[in-house]
Amino acid sequence: MTKKQKKVLIRIIVSAVLLAGIMIITKLVEINKWIQFALYLVPYLIIGYDILKKALKGIFKGQIFDENFLMAVATVGAVALGEFSEGAAVMLFYQIGELFQSVAVGKSRKNITSLMDIRPDYANVELNGKVEKIDPDDVEIGTEIIVNPGEKVPIDGVIISGDSTLNTSALTGESVPRSAKVGDEIISGCINLTGVLKIKTTKEFGDSTVSKILDLVENSSMKKSKSENFITKFARYYTPAVCGGALLLAILPPIIRLISGTGAMLGEWITRALTFLVISCPCALVISIPLSFFAGIGCASANGVLVKGSNYLEALSDTQYVVFDKTGTLTKGVFEVTGIYPANNFDKDTLIRLAAFAESASSHPISVSLKKNYGKEINIDEVSDIQEIAGHGVSALVDGKRVFAGNIKLMKKENISVECEHDEGTVVYVSCDGEYAGCIVISDVVKENSKKAISSLKKSGIDKTVMLTGDSKQAAERVAKSLGLDEYHAELLPSDKVDWVEKLLSQKSAKKKLAFVGDGINDAPVLSRADIGIAMGALGSDAAIEAADIVLMDDDPSKIALARKISVHTLKIVKENIVFALAIKAICLVLGALGIANMWVAIFADVGVMILAVLNAIRALKIK
């Protein structure tokens, strides 16, 4: 609890004890009305002074019709009619409901505002032989910073010295620490757990991951869902309407009774009108609906899914088509050796060694993957005369033998017959002294959770999953078949992807949504065009993250199905609260107008319904 909440709790306890004591005393002993008034006024003012103050401020500002005004009128009216205990009780239970709501909002906010804790206070920079703590805003690109164990990584960069494990839970929701070593990219907001790291910054603080996340979090509450906008408009007209209804209930029946000669019974009808006012307070709706979405967004944040507004969370539940980019989204976006097929008298170890040595001078991603798979240090004394053959591959002397490594064109050029029918990725053919040594297949590896992501989406009710890629048809077909995608389109330019999304948008149902999932800078246009743009946050480009409506902080595509599940359950809770609150209030309003429901029933219809609605709303925090 916050200090403010603790103070309110103390006021509630003091007021409740005093109220209970006074009620017992007045039941046992006959006390003068004015003394009763003075006694009940103490707990009433202890618990309700701030509500009365807010109501008066609202009147002076012209913002009359809110819950503070309703409570002030109802309780002051009850006290004026001599219903002292009821007036104090209404204010007491209203404050209990408000405290309950405040604690629930705090709980929901905790998951989101925990992201605020990722903001670093300083960066360790070596200046004139001394390590000094400076403001991250003052650190320039290319600066070498030091991150000690237990400190937050202040700015995005590359590790140039040291190895460690990182706690990324605040960003990704993943509790298992990740290892980090020299050459790895590192994003701000992580907590360094073990070793000392020296990092060369690649961005300014304002453009780093932590700054972008904080900006997104701060602006997320500005984008309201249709349900929230409906409740806001509803309350704008509903509250003045019920105030008018209560006024008519207090005036019209007594006038009619006077005309008919049956006695006005003004006090009775004013009591009914005040009961009507308490029942009609829209707290349950005004509080629980935004709270439900807030809790849903908080639940998503705790699982590493950053939703930029409740309107996007709501839209997820209506998603019909999910369209994926391939590289970096469904696949890792890095080349790896996926097959080694030696020929003639060569074995796998010899084949990969020949290829790695021949490619040793190249920084091409394919060359890097060959050297990585070889896994040993390359002795430069054993390789010489390296020549790059444009559009074909490389040639080199390895252990004094002429080695060629490249595509099929290179083999044909050297009149070397090959036997390799593997076309699932990029194929590197290798020959040694004119003899075919075999082939190595290099592919962009599918992410571990991609198949689970597609399967989960289909189970959740998604009608169609589509992949759009600029890669070859063979590579696209291999990935699409392995993942069980409904449709794929290959060899596309960024503009072609937009065209395909336009086409799919025209095919879907009018009320349904299309979500696009991507990570690259060339995905920004299509992310903006889709109904819902979902970006990869860990390795995704800044442009993609900025254009997206939802960000997956750990690049796990299976989190999309989880986000949709959170959306569907949140919407279900919202609808439950709307129906429940309106139904109970409608019944109690009729009973109040007929004089059947008293002020205690009104308290349940207002505070009781609000507490039940809030309890239901915070269930959105626990969706798994």
Predicted ranges, named:
Residues 398-400, 426, 432-576:
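Conserved ATP-binding TGD loop and adjacent catalytic N/P-domain core of P-type ATPases
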Residues 23, 35, 40-126, 138-145, ...:
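Actuator/coupling domain of P-type ATPases
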Residues 68-72, 171, 271, 281-358, ...:
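Conserved catalytic phosphorylation-site environment of P-type ATPases
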Residues 56-66, 103-113, 291-310, 618-624:
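Juxtamembrane helix-loop transition segments at the membrane interface in multi-pass membrane proteins
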Residues 148, 341-464, 473, 485-501:
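P-type ATPase nucleotide-binding
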Residues 245, 508-511, 548, 553-624:
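Membrane-embedded transport module
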Residues 1-14, 238:
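N-terminal membrane topogenic signal
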Residues 16-17, 229-260, 272-293, 575-604:
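Bilayer-spanning, highly hydrophobic alpha-helical transmembrane segments
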